[in-house]
From Swiss-Prot:
Catalytic activity: Endopeptidase with strict specificity for lysyl bonds
E.C. designation(s): 3.4.22.47
Positions annotated as propeptide: 25-228
Gene3D superfamilies: 2.60.120.200, 2.60.40.3800, 3.40.50.1460, Gingipain r, domain 1 (3.40.50.10390), Immunoglobulins (2.60.40.10)
Residues annotated as binding Ca(2+) 3: S987, E989, S1021, G1023, D1145, E1146
Family designation: Belongs to the peptidase C25 family.
Residue numbers marked as site, Cleavage: R228, D229, R737, A738, R1155, A1156, K1290, P1291
Annotated segments matching region Disordered: 965-985
Source organism per UniProt: Porphyromonas gingivalis (Bacteroides gingivalis)
Name assigned to this protein: Lys-gingipain HG66
Gene name as annotated: kgp
Modification(s) after translation: Proteolytically cleaved into a catalytic subunit and three adhesins. Arg-gingipain is involved in this post-translational processing.
InterPro entries named among the record's database cross-references: Caspase-like_dom_sf, Cleaved_adhesin, Gingipain, Gingipain_N_sf, Gingipain_propep_sf, Ig-like_fold, Pept_C25_gingipain_C, Peptidase_C25_Ig-like_domain
Entry superkingdom: Bacteria
Amino acid sequence: MRKLLLLIAASLLGVGLYAQNAKIKLDAPTTRTTCTNNSFKQFDASFSFNEVELTKVETKGGTFASVSIPGAFPTGEVGSPEVPAVRKLIAVPVGATPVVRVKSFTEQVYSLNQYGSEKLMPHQPSMSKSDDPEKVPFAYNAAAYARKGFVGQELTQVEMLGTMRGVRIAALTINPVQYDVVANQLKVRNNIEIEVSFQGADEVATQRLYDASFSPYFETAYKQLFNRDVYTDHGDLYNTPVRMLVVAGAKFKEALKPWLTWKAQKGFYLDVHYTDEAEVGTTNASIKAFIHKKYNDGLAASAAPVFLALVGDTDVISGEKGKKTKKVTDLYYSAVDGDYFPEMYTFRMSASSPEELTNIIDKVLMYEKATMPDKSYLEKALLIAGADSYWNPKIGQQTIKYAVQYYYNQDHGYTDVYSYPKAPYTGCYSHLNTGVGFANYTAHGSETSWADPSVTATQVKALTNKNKYFLAIGNCCVTAQFDYPQPCFGEVMTRVKEKGAYAYIGSSPNSYWGEDYYWSVGANAVFGVQPTFEGTSMGSYDATFLEDSYNTVNSIMWAGNLAATHAENIGNVTHIGAHYYWEAYHVLGDGSVMPYRAMPKTNTYTLPASLPQNQASYSIQASAGSYVAISKDGVLYGTGVANASGVATVNMTKQITENGNYDVVITRSNYLPVIKQIQAGEPSPYQPVSNLTATTQGQKVTLKWDAPSAKKAEGSREVKRIGDGLFVTIEPANDVRANEAKVVLAADNVWGDNTGYQFLLDADHNTFGSVIPATGPLFTGTASSNLYSANFEYLIPANADPVVTTQNIIVTGQGEVVIPGGVYDYCITNPEPASGKMWIAGDGGNQPARYDDFTFEAGKKYTFTMRRAGMGDGTDMEVEDDSPASYTYTVYRDGTKIKEGLTATTFEEDGVAAGNHEYCVEVKYTAGVSPKVCKDVTVEGSNEFAPVQNLTGSAVGQKVTLKWDAPNGTPNPNPNPNPGTTTLSESFENGIPASWKTIDADGDGHGWKPGNAPGIAGYNSNGCVYSESFGLGGIGVLTPDNYLITPALDLPNGGKLTFWVCAQDANYASEHYAVYASSTGNDASNFTNALLEETITAKGVRSPEAIRGRIQGTWRQKTVDLPAGTKYVAFRHFQSTDMFYIDLDEVEIKANGKRADFTETFESSTHGEAPAEWTTIDADGDGQGWLCLSSGQLDWLTAHGGTNVVASFSWNGMALNPDNYLISKDVTGATKVKYYYAVNDGFPGDHYAVMISKTGTNAGDFTVVFEETPNGINKGGARFGLSTEADGAKPQSVWIERTVDLPAGTKYVAFRHYNCSDLNYILLDDIQFTMGGSPTPTDYTYTVYRDGTKIKEGLTETTFEEDGVATGNHEYCVEVKYTAGVSPKKCVNVTINPTQFNPVKNLKAQPDGGDVVLKWEAPSAKKAEGSREVKRIGDGLFVTIEPANDVRANEAKVVLAADNVWGDNTGYQFLLDADHNTFGSVIPATGPLFTGTASSNLYSANFEYLIPANADPVVTTQNIIVTGQGEVVIPGGVYDYCITNPEPASGKMWIAGDGGNQPARYDDFTFEAGKKYTFTMRRAGMGDGTDMEVEDDSPASYTYTVYRDGTKIKEGLTETTYRDAGMSAQSHEYCVEVKYAAGVSPKVCVDYIPDGVADVTAQKPYTLTVVGKTITVTCQGEAMIYDMNGRRLAAGRNTVVYTAQGGYYAVMVVVDGKSYVEKLAVK
């Protein structure tokens, strides 16, 4: 947040600093607009402005200044000075005339000369996108610029525009600025207070019209009215349900049926008509008249249609020529009132055949019903500002950056936003194939294409985005011109089958740059300046993301058109006009669709078990704001909207009068639809299951439920008479086997003296009347000890004994016994120690306590409950049905029975297909079945091995770069992709679980709490948790340090944490929090390193309502990677105070599984270089570290596998003392490393260690886990070849295998070669890492193919580079290798262009003082200057010249190269004579240079340059080039030279032969400066010869050109740096291109954004001190002190002193015309 504030401050500090811009502070503290005292009679309004900004503008007509005010837009007569105005759309009552009275204002005059400002820019007309800016004349009214005095419009103006959907619309304009061009002065009227009265207003008629036409679907439009609060708020939609008028060509009747059925199910009341109806007709006039009548009739009945659907092409519904555009338009079908405002949302499903209409409908139905198999594409968006050298940097880039900044970002749920604000556009349209939910292009277009970057209608037909249909918007010319002779671009986009878009918004005529800008971001946006949400009216982007509106494709277009309406200037034809834009833009496809904004939410709903007949309404629970519809067979019965409590009252316009299944559909903007069926009729007597839940793991679905809440569904309650006045109640239950019964004895200390009861059962039923007396006690005194055992088979309790003082009794609680069903005698005894009697309980209950021949039925449970009854006691008996077969469960998936006869309350199904499924469970009783209870389940992934996503390929020079995204979902070897093991998922619906821990570290008594405070709502439900930095109820300011800690986790391989967070109050949003992981304990001290730490900023809250009103901020999803071994995760709220609450919800942790095992073979590494993808450290600093060796280069080497190994030397021609590290990439999760090593058999003591690091890759991060000194390896064993090198044989040992266990937490592995010297080498090959865990979704690697040949495998990164690729077209493919199989390949074509002009590399822009310094690297190869050149240099001799670069401009390079030409280790020398006087004397014209022995100074005396440098005139010399090459750099000029070949056998110093393309001896040869001459020796017949190649080596073979914000500011540069003076305070785009002789490279660009203004750290021409809170600045110039809001606090010359309040400040000093800015903090 601090950086953002400093950026703001830096822009405000521009007063007088630079000629580029300045800001004039006005006499108001803030810019503010208010509407108060709003009624049908009048309203009051105030307008205040805190600043005016001046911006320098370079034009074809010269240099001018542009003046702007936040929230205003430029106005003026064309060619006259342009000034800002504010425009508001207002609602005007029926019959009223709006009158404006100015109550007060302030006025000040400002001299622009004091700010170094030029004259104000003349206002220019709107420019069509079809215009060439270079050919459009610059409008300049000379008379206007000679006029003296202040000129401008009246302060206020009001103009009636028309009626829009029942609301009369007028434009209120405030003109706060007048301008005196001669004096160059502004007059600013500020703090304006006005009253707008409505004279003649008819309040009753106004409200009646509004009520009759109202629909919440027009909320987007109503919200743009300045005085919108005047109308009654309609919170319910069932009073005004959605109505749609459909007019279609007769040939589409059958094709339309599925769409009409769905719209009725969704809750649309349809009025459908066809052109073969006489009332409709086929002409434009008759169709228009019919539609107007339908609307007016509907309005009179308060049933006006919301949508108008036109179905067919112009052959059935023609449209008409626009009054302003002169192109085809559908506007006038829906503009009923005679103005240009439509009354209905109109869209055209343009199709020329029923088949094309079916294509459109199929895409719409899949999108609206959300039946696409993979919804993740909805989280992706494509945004393109197309190419235009003039307008792209002024409007295009700003449009796309606004969309990304405020909406299309992670905060709003987007995982991938493919943003192309400027070139290059490489691969941009490939994203349409891989899947995006939204695509927006703004720039040039044609009837059949988006122009640049180009995608044509033909290419649209070749798209491959099946099941991934999107909304497309084209802000460009004529792409929706639907009467074009062939299908226009928008028609093709929607008509194509199983690809393309479900809807397209575009313009029929040419569109305009300014209006398209306003259309997207809102009116008042200033060209060339990045717009802000606060500074613009509502545009189409803003409307799309209104949280609580019924956003449709049509409402997005309306918002754009209203923004253009905002910008139309009263009285001046300065813009193309709102009327033009209402005629221009159209929706092709289905405009009634509500687009999903990233991943839609899940609706929380509860449906009734059944729908009773003949009811006027039904109550259905759903998420607040949901639209609920009940229908049957495509006929709509009723609709309703869920209120704030989540209850929808569905008002039935057609009552249910018969049984059957009825469709219930629940929809809400950005929520998945709910599509269910409910049976109509009386409630079922058969109870269903309860608490049905469904979970998924991969493609396994697990259902769990609770048994029916009571088991009374088998029959009604039965009361059975069992004796005189005695009854028993029998009801369902379940516990025992079918042939058994259960008897339960229950008591609750009936007598209060701890005496209890016993139950005695006689299975022979012959004890009644003898052992069991008919009356009186069982016995008195002492009974026989075997009384019970001899007479009663079953006892309760089991140890009951015949003792009156017994403790074996049921006092409190219950006992039970299971008995065979049958006839028994029984009695219930009550031993009484005081009387010495064993009483039999009384008969005061519903059942006797003694019984002769009682039948206990099998399958029943008999509960005898003892109780007081008057002065005695008694027994109440309850009998329950205890049969296990009283019911079973049946399971359905998607309406199909998949399992029946279940008795358990759980069910699992594996291998379920990916997608959305409905699982239902019903209970089957003997006499009937219960209603189904259902649950929606989403199974992720697909049934194949998932491929990579979004593969792109690019080429620079001969280097190809591939990039891709990981497979969708997280596939595993099942082969079905598995989303991973969910370790924890918590939505806090029931508060903070007991297993979570909270710590109130600051001890204020306020920690994390469950979200049940007023106004707190969870992300996707009611529950969340929160922590306070300001407490309500008198608590006040808090300084929290609160921890919320998860239960213990098991994440051996790490995991991924996702959660949702928001600030409770969008206006007090700066809540600071962090996320930590601990691998040890869960105390606060265990959480030290934050994985994520941030402050939620107000700028981060992008919901329009959240900015405009104080409500809960926007929920944002965060994702954090958890390290291996994580045991606890903590959310810490701290470093916040005096804000409000931070809310947390939907915490989910998924465990990472096993990463794929992988083996490093070093086959992709290059001989003699450090191994690819490994890090090396030469810790001893001898310049000789680990490097790759190839057996193809070394005869003595044999790799373990393939050809390559890595090696480190302790002797390499000299003794070495190595300390070399070879470090792996991140191998988190590895448990073992297996590798092979070899050494020199004769010198085997090269010591090495295997080391691990759990942190970083510095040498100090590693510890030893294994080390050894190889010794005695394979003595006397095999040898693997001998070297031909001078140091003799290097016998290699056999390869030795080692496996080392790695400790938990290992992140990097290093092989260290050290503690040895003067031996030879150690080799490593085939290093294999075994990863821990079980196979999971991340268990895969990537394989890359070029032209069908595998070139790289085992990749784990999502990028790949290959250099040196041959010229031509290549197909690159990437496949995913899983444990169980491989994915389909994804492929991309890449072209290597030999004439490509290579660009610069690594361009950077950095501040330096007040300047911006650019630095870059030269092009990777300098062969772009021209084609290969062959030059004749003598008879039959040619030299090839091609580009290169190595030496300084006045020098040349000579290279001598050979490859053991004669096979005898004799080589060559190159001798150059700079005096060029040796030819014919020292250098003979023919024959050898000398024979025998030459003078030792022969070379030094005659030749200034030698190759090799130590060449000597000895025929036995070793100082020669045998294999390889040598070189020398010489001044460019004329030389004599010769190339010698010493031959010891003959004793001659031969001069090489002339068998090549260049003589080996030469008189006066010119070596040109800036060239490289390579002389390659070769055999030529019986002799030898020289082939010479000359390369252009001049550093000036190209120059650099620098651009700032699209304007060329420097060319002809040869250095790789450039300083742009005085530019560090503003944001700029810098570009550098390379200019070659034959062409120019692509530009490479970088955005420079100042961090505040660049800090000055050295040689500051001022002193700055802070003592306490006093800031003192001393300088020889001007000094100013600002706060971080840009307010100037103090200013003066030489010395400025200011006493601060604490916080951040900025000091600006201007000395000798140069500015310096420094930030400081005052505590």
